[in-house]
Curated annotation (Swiss-Prot):
GO terms for molecular function: D-tyrosyl-tRNA(Tyr) deacylase activity; Gly-tRNA(Ala) deacylase activity; Ser(Gly)-tRNA(Ala) hydrolase activity; tRNA binding. This is D-aminoacyl-tRNA deacylase. It is found in: Cytoplasm. Gene3D superfamilies: D-tyrosyl-tRNA(Tyr) deacylase. It comes from Anoxybacillus flavithermus (strain DSM 21510 / WK1). An aminoacyl-tRNA editing enzyme that deacylates mischarged D-aminoacyl-tRNAs. Also deacylates mischarged glycyl-tRNA(Ala), protecting cells against glycine mischarging by AlaRS. Acts via tRNA-based rather than protein-based catalysis; rejects L-amino acids rather than detecting D-amino acids in the active site. By recycling D-aminoacyl-tRNA to D-amino acids and free tRNA molecules, this enzyme counteracts the toxicity associated with the formation of D-aminoacyl-tRNA entities in vivo and helps enforce protein L-homochirality. One of its GO terms (cellular component) is cytoplasm. The keyword Oxidoreductase does not apply. It catalyses: glycyl-tRNA(Ala) + H2O = tRNA(Ala) + glycine + H(+); a D-aminoacyl-tRNA + H2O = a tRNA + a D-alpha-amino acid + H(+). Its main location: cytoplasm.
Length: 146
């Protein structure tokens, strides 16, 4: 499992011109799933992200978590995170999970975050989406399960 984590002042995702998910403050997650990812991977990554100390404390030091600041998450499924660009000029997506498996793990991941008391907004799995955000910092990290 591979997740790009972006700290955001605000973010929204639209499908066919309609807003389907929106947050005011928190994290935007681009979530990629590979073939052998499990619900345990989803739980590990969800816990890691929920407790990452990437928000500033009163001294301006990155020292508090999303849970500490009461932020929300905009979670977007993105199979292209497993695109292999080493050969040729066209990415190979063979490492991305099949849609049925990916959707199951993606939904389990979002549920793990919700169980921690985090408000989670999502896009539409498998849809063409427009994602807009204001990245604060900017702070962008990659969290992987393996």
């Amino acid at each position: 499992m591979r997740v790009v984590v972006q700290r955001a002042k605000d973010a929204k995702v639209t499908v066919a011109g309609e807003v389907v998910g929106e947050i005011d403050f928190g994290l935007v997650l681009l979530v990629g799933i590979t073939h052998d990812d499990t619900e345990e991977d989803a739980a590990f990554v969800a816990d890691k992200i929920a407790h990452l100390r990437i928000f500033e404390d009163e001294h301006g030091k990155m020292n508090v978590s999303l849970i500490d600041v009461g932020g929300a998450i905009l979670s977007i499924s993105q199979f292209t995170l497993y695109g292999d660009c080493r050969k040729g000029r066209r990415p190979n997506f063979m490492d991305a999970a099949k849609p049925e498996h990916a959707k199951h793990i993606y939904e389990a991941f979002n549920e793990q975050l919700r169980q921690k008391g985090i408000r989670v907004e999502t896009g539409v799995f498998g849809a063409m989406m427009d994602v807009m955000l204001t990245n604060v910092g900017p702070v962008t990290l990659i969290v992987e399960s393996k």
